[in-house]
Amino acid sequence: MARYTGPKCKLARREGTDLFLKSARRSIDSKCKLDSRPGQHGAKQPRLSDYGIHLREKQKIRRIYGVLERQFRKYFAEAERRKGSTGENLLQILESRLDNVVYRMGYGSTRAESRQLVSHKAIVVNGEVVNIPSYQVKAGDVVSVREKSKKQVRIAESLALAEQIGFPGWVSVDPKKMEGTFKNAPERSELSSDINEQLVVEFYSK
């Protein structure tokens, strides 16, 4: 399955919520009518069946993190194997992806841009260049911008904005050095309450 490269607003309208695909730090443009379906006439969202509700939540989470279906299923299987809550485990696996950590540290303004930085070898983990967006970052890992990439204006601008707003508690970042530490995978209480991971667990359990 190919990665979606079309209008980001269309995805947000399909899910009926801001997926933060266009900007990392602010809500989506008001022109994007989230209560209307995508399309020329933008009909109102229909009432969903129980299956539809579960499917939409799964799709929403998958699109927020920019993960394809096959990989998302693998993450769910891994989450089931781990001790504890399967739903929380799933979110921690997604949050530990290198592209997501780069986003959380403010190097990229969106997860898509952060994924591009990783793929273009602009990111270093513990002193080694890593160009795999799905790489699982571990507690204590140091994630920084590669020396030759520190002059990129987009990285500096994104970091400046992230510093103003504040970094999440599970990472520590030195904006001047463009270096950060992944302290630990976030607890469920630290993540968005707009996500209902239990619906994903129920979806795959049916």
From Swiss-Prot:
SMART domains: Ribosomal_S4, S4. Signal peptide: none annotated. One of its GO terms (cellular component) is small ribosomal subunit. PROSITE patterns: RIBOSOMAL_S4, S4. The keyword Transcription regulation does not apply. GO terms for biological process: ribosomal small subunit biogenesis; translation. The keyword rRNA-binding applies. Gene3D superfamilies: Ribosomal Protein S4 Delta 41, Chain A, domain 1 (1.10.1050.10), RNA-binding S4 domain (3.10.290.10). Keywords: Ribonucleoprotein, Ribosomal protein, RNA-binding, rRNA-binding. It comes from the Bacteria. GO terms for molecular function: rRNA binding; structural constituent of ribosome. Residues 96-156 form the S4 RNA-binding domain. Part of the 30S ribosomal subunit. Contacts protein S5. The interaction surface between S4 and S5 is involved in control of translational fidelity. One of the primary rRNA binding proteins, it binds directly to 16S rRNA where it nucleates assembly of the body of the 30S subunit. With S5 and S12 plays an important role in translational accuracy. Belongs to the universal ribosomal protein uS4 family. This is Small ribosomal subunit protein uS4. It comes from Laribacter hongkongensis (strain HLHK9).
